[in-house]
A protein has these predicted regions:
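A generic structural signal for ordered alpha-helices
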Residues: 1-2, 201
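Alpha-helical scaffold segments that mediate packing/assembly in large oligomeric complexes
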Residues: 3-96, 104-122, 247-248
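Sequence/fold signature of self-assembling virion shell proteins
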Residues: 56-72, 113-248
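Short hydrophobic beta-strand segments
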Residues: 99-103, 180-181
Length: 248
């Protein structure tokens, strides 16, 4: 970002700091987009990827309430993925270590399925969830924080895929038709040299550095955000990607 002295002097607010915050937010959204692309690329998972119909017998939003018809599709798919991960890690990674990451427009149709309605209706915690007595980060999207022993996280980051000056095209960073199941044991920051079963690692060289330059010769202020990192899905055995998740 760049502003002339006149614009900065006449602004009623700290215009340089405000745009530095905007640039940092864009960099954070960019990081989310890059990590999301990595975890939604089926080639990163080896043999640990399959369609919803192959795992559960139907699309994830077609589960029934009593096991008839398609049956408990979501449960069957999650259990099949969990078993594959558990076997592939020699029993090390269990469902309690796994996180299902879903986009809002994947969580919504799943939450409206008969299978999920029955699951919540028969849960002893259902009334507390409905009344709001128990905080839920997924409540807006209709899914509990834990489902069939798997934790759920809804990725609701939004980005504009068009360039500046074009008509905005807003969408979720996360895809609505895939469900990555990722291992997230232990703490956020790992220990160098120690074994890790965490699915995704972000290698950071320089993190979110905001730089400002007072360009006296051109009578302007210039700024930028430096975020130097790379991301990899390093533990494919501890991860699973369910594709073609929804019946659209």
């Amino acid at each position: 970002f760049r502003f002339g002295y006149k614009a900065v002097d006449q602004a009623d607010w700290n215009i340089v700091a405000a745009h530095a915050e905007d640039a940092a937010q864009q960099a954070m959204t960019g990081r989310t987009l890059n990590v999301t692309t990595t975890i939604e690329t089926s080639g990163n998972y080896g043999s640990n990827t399959s369609s919803a119909t192959s795992l559960g017998g139907d699309f994830l939003n077609n589960g029934t309430a009593d096991g008839s018809g398609s049956g408990y599709v979501l449960k069957k798919a999650l259990q099949a993925a969990g078993i594959a991960i558990n076997k592939g890690t020699w029993g090390t990674v269990k469902p309690k270590d796994l996180v299902c990451r879903a986009a809002p427009d994947l969580a919504d149709p799943i939450s409206r399925s008969k299978e999920i309605h029955a699951y919540l209706k028969e849960s002893p915690f259902a009334l507390a969830q409905v009344r709001g007595d128990v905080e839920s980060q997924n409540g807006l999207w209709g899914l509990p924080d834990s489902l069939y022993g798997f934790k759920w996280v809804i990725e609701d980051a939004v980005y504009n895929s068009k360039k500046k000056g074009d008509t905005a095209s807003l969408g979720y960073v996360a895809s609505s038709n895939v469900l990555p199941i990722l291992a997230r044991p232990g703490k956020l920051v790992g220990v160098v040299g120690a074994p890790s079963f965490s699915s995704v690692h972000v290698w950071v060289y320089e993190e979110m550095t905001v730089e400002n330059k007072d360009d006296v010769d051109n009578r302007r202020h210039s700024g930028r955000v430096v975020d130097d990192y790379g991301q990899d899905l390093v533990a494919s055995a501890a991860s699973y990607l369910i594709t073609l998740a929804l019946h659209t």
